[in-house]
Design a protein with these regions (language model features):
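SIR2/sirtuin-family catalytic core signature
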Residues: 14-25, 45-50, 59-67, 80, ...
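Metabolite-binding pocket within alpha/beta catalytic cores that recognizes anionic/polar moieties
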Residues: 1-52, 80-84
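Class I SAM-dependent methyltransferase SAM-binding "motif I" and its flanking Rossmann-like core
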Residues: 64, 69-86
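Short beta-strand/turn micro-motifs composed of small residues
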Residues: 32, 74, 147-149
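Active-site glycine-rich loop that binds ribose-phosphate moieties when present
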Residues: 87-102, 128
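Active-site metal-binding loops of divalent metal-dependent hydrolases
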Residues: 35, 75, 118
Length: 189
């Protein structure tokens, strides 16, 4: 099953314009839950050397002359047998991948994050953000996320109101973690 899912997303995609924009910025640390290698491809096109971390032992190693670190907390397409994809794997993540939890916690405490294309439904990130909120309360670092606003399009009034309510509740919830949502109308913006 894991191989089938990962084969569906493997290697066929090319980085988007947004990937290229991110790679061109002076960003030294990337965290992703994606298995693909689009960030790495984008960095390579910018002549930047990525130090990719997708296994626990990678965390203790440093690639010389690296331009950026890419943390792939749920694994990499190149090691499909080690990806985090099932509910059981998500549930055991804080124990089996504790060094990733520690590293991400440290970065969330000491660095400002910009979340892009993230649904905030990942239980591992929720676990980490919750622990930081409990420990640091109002002394958390401010983070940001880009969220696409709800479009009326073909939605009925009731559907639109429901989607808008869900979005507003998510934004309110993100505020608990000091994540400010910036609404955009179109991803091209």
């Amino acid at each position: 099953l894991t191989d089938h899912i990962l084969n569906e997303i493997s290697g066929l995609e090319e980085p988007t314009r947004n990937h290229q924009i991110l790679a061109s910025l002076p960003i030294s640390t990337y965290w992703t839950t994606n298995y693909d290698n689009l960030i790495e491809k984008s960095l390579q096109k910018e002549n930047k050397l990525a130090d990719v971390k997708h296994r626990v032992p990678h965390l203790a190693q440093t690639k010389k002359r690296r331009s950026a670190i890419v943390y792939k907390m749920h694994g990499d397409i190149s090691a499909s047998d080690e990806t985090i994809i099932t509910k059981d794997e998500y549930e055991s993540y804080p124990l089996k991948y504790a060094p990733f939890v520690t590293a991400l916690s440290g970065d969330l405490i000491s660095k400002t994050f910009l979340f892009l294309g993230f649904s905030f439904s990942d239980p591992n990130l929720d676990y980490i953000l919750s622990r930081i909120r409990i420990h640091f309360s109002e002394n958390q670092r401010q983070h940001y996320c880009l969220v696409k606003d709800i479009e009326k399009n073909k939605l009925t009034d009731d559907e639109y109101d429901y989607q808008k309510l869900k979005l507003n509740l998510m934004i309110k919830d993100l505020n608990r973690f000091h994540i400010k949502a910036v609404l955009i109308q179109d991803w091209k913006d």
